[in-house]
């Protein structure tokens, strides 16, 4: 088993198995004294795109939180019904109901948090473009 290759990563890259060569294929091992300067300008468009991407991610997470709250709430109601239907195991069903209700509240809080993060990113995206909307009452 020691001689087998163990891959701990999800994807295996073929270039890892190739032996390293002594010659650099990009520059063929030749050095020059020429210097190339590249200027990178971080414009407002890149910042705007980043904020919009984050806003989309927060919206997706908000929807996952809402779905989790809905599922946990439905399970809590189911356990409440089972507690009435099965009196022998009513105590176990009541405990499970409380745990599910707590999970529903937590998921709802997470959805609420992501909603506010989404609003914050939306506002930041508007500010990064330099255009402000004129809200008269607020």
Curated annotation (Swiss-Prot):
Entry comment describing in which tissues the protein is expressed: Expressed in the basal region of leaf sheaths. Highly expressed in stems, and at lower levels in roots, leaf sheaths and panicles.
Pfam families cross-referenced by the UniProt entry: ABA_WDS
Primary subcellular site in the record, as a coarse category: nucleus
Composition bias, Basic residues: 1-13
Domain of life: Eukaryota
Induction: Induced by gibberellin (at protein level) in the nucleus. Induced by abscisic acid (at protein level). Induced by aluminum in roots and shoots. Induced by abscisic acid (ABA). Induced by drought and cold stresses in leaves. Induced by cold stress, osmotic shock, salt stress, ABA and ethylene.
Protein's cellular compartments: Nucleus; Cytoplasm
Consequences of knocking out this gene: No visible phenotype under normal growth conditions, but mutant plants are hypersensitive to drought stress, and have decreased sensitivity to abscisic acid-induced germination inhibition and oxidative stress-induced growth inhibition.
One of the record's GO cellular component terms: nucleus
Alphabetical list of InterPro entries matching this protein: ABA_WDS
GO biological process: regulation of DNA-templated transcription; response to aluminum ion; response to oxidative stress; response to water deprivation
The entry's keywords: Cytoplasm, Nucleus, Stress response
GO molecular function: sequence-specific DNA binding
Residue ranges of the region described as Disordered: 1-27, 106-138
Keyword check for Nucleus: yes
Further comment found in the protein's record: Plants silencing ASR5 exhibit delayed flowering, abnormal panicles, reduced seed number, reduced number of trichomes on leaves, palea and lemma, and exhibit sensitivity to aluminum and drought stress. Plants over-expressing ASR5 exhibit enhanced tolerance to salt stress, osmotic shock and drought stress.
Family: Belongs to the abscisic acid and water stress-induced protein family.
Job of this protein: May function in gibberellin signaling pathway downstream of GID1 and SLR1. May be involved in the regulation of plant growth in the basal region of leaf sheaths. Involved in tolerance to aluminum. Regulates the expression of different genes that collectively contribute to the protection of the cell in response to aluminum stress. Binds to the promoter and regulates the expression of target genes involved in aluminum stress response. Binds to the promoter of STAR1 gene, which encodes an ABC transporter required for aluminum tolerance. Involved in drought tolerance.
PANTHER family registered for this protein in UniProt: ABSCISIC STRESS-RIPENING PROTEIN 5 (PTHR33801:SF24)
Protein name: Abscisic stress-ripening protein 5
